C-alpha cells in the first residue's frame, strides 16, 4: 500500500502562553527552537514531545529566534529590542545585545565571522560584532518593519526584506546600499539566496515569488499569483528547485522558464519555517500555545514542470552607484558562483590550526551579571547530553543526512490520528518517550539512547495506520461522552435536560412501540417529540436573560453574575462568561469568588463548548491573579487590617477552588484533540500555584 506524500508528524504544547516564533535547525532539521509570550526560549528534538532545554533571561516576550548554521548557537530577540545569544552546549547566555527601540522581527548569523544581523519594527537593520558586544553599523532606509534578513553565502552581502514591499541589498565591505528591488506589491515575507548561483528569490504577501539575477540586477521571472500569501521559501540544497510554502500548500518551482513542478497539500496552516533534511521537507507552524510539525516527502515529487504564464514585469537595471561585481566562477546556467571559502585574514606569522580537546574548549565570554541557573532549565538531560554535549566538537549537532521520518500509509478514508496520545513526561522518563505517531528508526543518531531495550514492534510497513504506543497503565479516556460543538450530524439531545428542575418532567414523552408498524399519527408525534420541551427551554431562557439584562444595564455586573449562578442554568452562565471573556476589566477578586465554584461544574460538562468556556475563564483567572493568590497565601494578615483580611479570605477561597480543580484537570490532560490541548495548557498554569 502506498504511503502519504505529506503528513503531520507531531503536535505539542510548546509554552505556557502563546507561541510567537519558531525556527528549525538548518543543518539537520532535527532540532527546533520556540519563543513565546512567557519570555522563554524552548529547545526541542523534532519528533519528540519533551522539551530538552528551557532558556530564560529575557524580560519581555520573545518575538524571533534563529539557529546558527552549525546549530551550536541560538539567538533570540524580544519585544523590547534586546537580543540574547545562547551557546547550547554549556546552555549559557554568551551575549546580550541592546540597541533596537522596538521588537526584533528577524535575525541571521554571518556564515563565517562572529557577526549577527537583526531587523526590527523600528525599520532599522543592525550589524553586531558578537566578540565586542556592540553594534558595528546601522542600516537605514526601510519605511516599515523589516520582515526578513539574510547574509549571502559568501558573507559579503546582506539582503533585507520589509513590509514596505522593498528588498535592499547592502554591501558589508562598503557599508552602504548596493541595490534596491521594488517589484513586489505587498510586504516581502521571504528571501533566499541560491546555494550556488548569483540568484535571489523573494516571496511576498502579494502571493508571488520573484527571481532576481544578482549580476545584472534584473528580474529573471515571476510566478503567477497563488491562492494565499507566501509564508516561507527555500532552495533545494542542489539548487534545482525552489520550494514555496503558503497557507496549507507547498509548491516546487523552476525559474528559467518559470514553471511549477509539483504541489503538495500539507495542511500546516500558516507555516512559520521550513528546512530540507535528507529527502524530506520539514515545516513547522504554531497556533496559540501549540506547535505542529509536518513532513513532505520530496522523493515523491513530480519533476515534470507545468509552464506558467510569465508575469509582465519591468526589467530592473543596476542603480548608477552600484559597482561591478568581481569575477567569480560560472555555474552551469552561466551565472557566477558564490565562493563559500572563508576569506583569509592578515596575520604577522603563520599558525597551525589549534585543535583543542574537549576539556580545553571554552565558550565565548559570558555576559556579566547573568547567572547560569537563572538562564537554563534542562528538562530532558538524556536528549540534551546526546544532542548538545557530544565527545567532539565535530559531531556537535545531529547529522544533516539523518534517517528520514517514516511515512504513514495512505489508507483511503482513514482519518489522521489525533495528536497527543501521550502527555509530556518528566525529564527522568524522557529517554524512553515515544517520538510521535510515526517513530523514527533506532539507528538515527540524533535520538537519545533508550535506557531499556525497546519491546518487539511490528514494522511500520505492516501497520494499517501508524499509532503511538500506549503505556500499559493508561486507562481509556471517557472522551466519547463529550458532545462535540462542531458536529455534522444530530446528537439526539434530550431537551428536558436543559429545563430547570421544576419543569424537567412536565413535557410528555412519546415512544412508539418498535414491534409494530407506526401509523401516520404516531409518526407525527415522533416528529413533534421534544418540541414542547424546547419551547419551555427557550421561554425559560428568555425570561432569565431579561432579568440578567435588567441588572447588568443598571451597572452591577457582580450582582447580575450572582443571579445567573443562582438560576442554575449552565447555558445562560456560558453565554455571560463568553461576554465577560471579551472584557477583561470586569474580572476582579469578587467576580472570581462568585464564578469559580461553577467553573468546576462546567469543566465536567458533557458539552464541548461548555468545557472550552470553563477552560478559557480558568486560564484568564490564573494568568491575571496567580501572583496575587500566592502572595496572600504566603503572607496572611498578622495585625488588624480589615481590607487585607477581606482580600486574604477571598484569595483563600479562590485558591481552594483552584486546588480542587487541579486533580480533575491533571486527569483530563491525557485526552486527545482540542480539549486535551486546553487541559494541558490549564495544567501548566495550575502548576504555578504554590
Curated annotation (Swiss-Prot):
This protein's UniProt keywords: Cell cycle, Cell division, Cytoplasm, Cytoskeleton, Microtubule, Mitosis, Repeat, WD repeat
Subcellular localization, as worded in the UniProt entry: Cytoplasm; Cytoplasm, Cytoskeleton, Microtubule organizing center, Centrosome; Cytoplasm, Cytoskeleton, Spindle pole; Cytoplasm, Cytoskeleton
Biased composition (Low complexity): 427-444
InterPro entries on file: G-protein_beta_WD-40_rep (IPR020472), Katanin_C-terminal (IPR028021), KTNB1 (IPR026962), WD40/YVTN_repeat-like_dom_sf (IPR015943), WD40_repeat_CS (IPR019775), WD40_repeat_dom_sf (IPR036322), WD40_rpt (IPR001680)
WD repeat copies, ranges: 14-54, 57-96, 99-138, 141-182, 184-222, 225-265
GO terms assigned for molecular function: microtubule binding
Pfam families, alphabetized: Katanin_con80, WD40
Ranges annotated as biased composition (Polar residues): 304-318
BP terms from Gene Ontology: cell division; microtubule depolymerization; microtubule severing
Chief place where the protein resides: cytoplasm
GO cellular component, one term: cytoplasm
Region described as Disordered: 304-527
Start-end of Basic and acidic residues biased regions: 351-361, 368-383, 517-527
Family affiliation: Belongs to the WD repeat KATNB1 family.
Stated role: Participates in a complex which severs microtubules in an ATP-dependent manner. May act to target the enzymatic subunit of this complex to sites of action such as the centrosome. Microtubule severing may promote rapid reorganization of cellular microtubule arrays and the release of microtubules from the centrosome following nucleation.
Record text on subunit structure and interactions: Interacts with KATNA1. This interaction enhances the microtubule binding and severing activity of KATNA1 and also targets this activity to the centrosome.
HAMAP family reported for this sequence: Katanin_p80_B1
This protein's name: Katanin p80 WD40 repeat-containing subunit B1
Natural source organism: Strongylocentrotus purpuratus
Name of the gene: KATNB1
Amino acid at each position: 500500500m502506498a504511503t502519504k506524500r505529506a503528513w503531520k508528524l507531531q503536535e505539542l504544547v510548546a509554552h505556557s502562553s502563546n507561541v510567537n516564533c519558531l525556527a528549525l535547525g538548518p543543518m539537520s532539521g532535527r532540532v527546533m527552537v520556540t519563543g513565546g509570550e512567557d519570555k522563554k526560549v524552548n529547545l526541542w528534538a523534532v519528533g519528540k514531545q519533551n522539551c530538552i532545554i528551557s532558556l530564560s533571561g529575557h524580560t519581555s516576550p520573545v518575538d524571533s529566534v534563529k539557529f546558527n548554521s552549525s546549530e551550536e548557537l541560538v539567538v533570540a530577540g524580544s519585544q523590547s529590542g534586546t537580543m540574547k545569544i545562547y551557546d547550547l552546549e554549556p546552555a549559557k547566555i554568551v551575549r546580550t545585545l541592546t540597541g533596537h527601540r522596538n521588537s526584533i522581527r528577524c535575525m541571521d548569523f554571518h556564515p563565517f565571522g562572529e557577526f549577527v544581523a537583526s531587523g526590527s519594527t523600528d525599520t532599522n537593520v543592525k550589524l553586531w560584532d558578537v566578540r565586542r558586544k556592540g553594534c558595528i553599523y546601522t542600516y537605514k532606509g526601510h519605511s516599515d518593519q523589516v520582515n526578513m534578513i539574510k547574509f549571502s553565502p559568501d558573507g559579503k552581502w546582506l539582503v533585507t526584506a520589509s513590509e514596505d514591499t522593498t528588498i535592499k541589498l547592502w554591501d558589508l565591505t562598503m557599508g552602504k546600499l548596493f541595490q534596491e528591488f521594488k517589484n513586489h506589491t505587498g510586504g516581502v515575507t521571504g528571501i533566499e539566496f541560491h546555494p550556488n548561483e548569483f540568484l535571489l528569490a523573494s516571496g511576498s504577501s502579494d502571493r508571488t515569488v520573484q527571481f532576481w539575477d544578482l549580476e545584472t540586477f534584473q528580474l529573471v521571472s515571476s510566478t503567477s499569483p497563488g491562492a494565499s500569501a507566501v509564508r516561507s521559501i527555500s532552495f533545494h540544497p542542489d539548487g534545482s528547485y525552489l520550494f514555496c510554502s503558503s497557507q496549507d500548500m507547498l509548491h516546487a518551482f523552476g525559474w528559467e522558464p518559470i514553471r511549477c513542478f509539483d504541489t503538495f497539500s500539507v495542511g500546516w496552516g500558516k507555516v512559520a519555517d521550513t528546512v530540507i533534511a535528507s529527502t524530506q521537507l520539514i515545516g513547522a507552524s504554531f497556533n496559540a500555545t501549540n506547535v505542529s510539525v509536518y513532513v513532505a516527502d520530496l522523493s515523491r515529487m513530480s519533476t515534470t514542470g507545468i509552464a506558467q504564464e510569465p508575469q509582465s514585469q519591468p526589467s530592473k537595471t543596476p542603480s548608477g552607484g552600484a559597482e561591478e561585481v568581481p569575477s567569480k566562477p560560472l555555474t552551469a546556467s552561466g551565472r557566477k558562483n558564490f565562493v563559500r571559502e572563508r576569506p583569509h585574514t592578515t596575520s604577522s606569522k603563520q599558525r597551525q590550526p589549534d585543535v583543542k580537546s574537549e576539556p580545553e574548549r571554552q565558550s565565548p565570554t559570558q555576559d556579566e551579571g547573568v547567572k547560569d541557573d537563572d538562564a537554563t532549565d534542562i528538562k530532558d538531560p538524556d536528549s540534551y547530553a546526546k544532542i548538545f554535549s557530544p565527545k567532539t566538537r565535530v559531531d556537535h549537532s545531529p547529522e544533516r543526512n539523518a534517517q528520514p521520518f517514516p511515512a504513514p500509509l495512505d489508507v483511503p478514508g482513514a482519518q489522521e490520528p489525533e495528536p497527543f496520545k501521550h502527555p509530556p513526561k518528566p525529564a527522568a522518563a524522557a529517554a524512553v518517550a515515544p517520538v510521535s505517531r510515526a517513530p523514527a528508526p533506532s539507528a538515527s543518531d540524533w535520538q537519545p539512547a533508550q535506557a531499556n531495550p525497546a519491546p518487539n514492534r511490528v514494522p511500520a510497513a505492516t501497520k494499517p495506520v501508524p499509532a503511538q504506543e500506549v503505556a500499559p497503565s493508561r486507562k481509556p479516556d471517557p472522551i466519547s461522552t463529550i458532545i462535540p460543538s462542531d458536529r455534522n450530524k444530530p446528537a439526539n439531545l434530550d431537551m428536558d435536560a436543559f429545563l430547570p428542575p421544576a419543569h424537567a418532567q412536565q413535557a410528555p414523552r412519546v415512544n412508539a412501540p418498535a414491534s409494530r408498524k407506526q401509523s401516520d399519527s404516531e409518526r407525527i408525534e415522533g416528529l413533534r417529540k421534544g418540541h414542547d420541551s424546547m419551547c419551555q427551554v427557550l421561554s425559560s431562557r428568555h425570561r432569565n436573560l431579561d432579568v440578567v439584562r435588567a441588572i447588568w444595564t443598571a451597572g452591577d455586573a457582580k450582582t447580575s453574575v450572582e443571579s445567573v449562578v443562582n438560576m442554575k442554568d449552565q447555558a445562560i452562565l456560558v453565554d455571560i462568561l463568553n461576554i465577560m471573556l471579551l472584557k477583561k476589566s470586569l474580572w476582579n477578586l469578587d467576580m472570581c469568588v462568585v464564578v469559580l465554584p461553577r467553573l468546576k461544574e462546567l469543566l465536567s460538562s458533557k458539552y464541548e463548548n461548555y468545557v472550552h468556556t470553563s477552560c478559557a475563564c480558568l486560564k484568564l483567572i490564573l494568568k491575571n491573579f496567580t501572583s496575587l493568590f500566592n502572595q496572600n497565601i504566603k503572607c496572611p494578615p498578622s495585625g488588624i487590617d480589615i481590607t487585607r483580611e477581606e482580600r486574604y479570605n477571598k484569595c483563600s477561597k479562590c485558591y481552594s477552588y483552584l486546588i480542587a480543580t487541579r486533580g480533575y484537570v491533571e486527569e483530563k490532560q491525557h485526552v486527545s484533540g482540542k480539549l486535551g490541548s486546553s487541559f494541558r495548557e490549564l495544567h501548566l498554569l495550575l502548576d504555578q500555584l504554590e
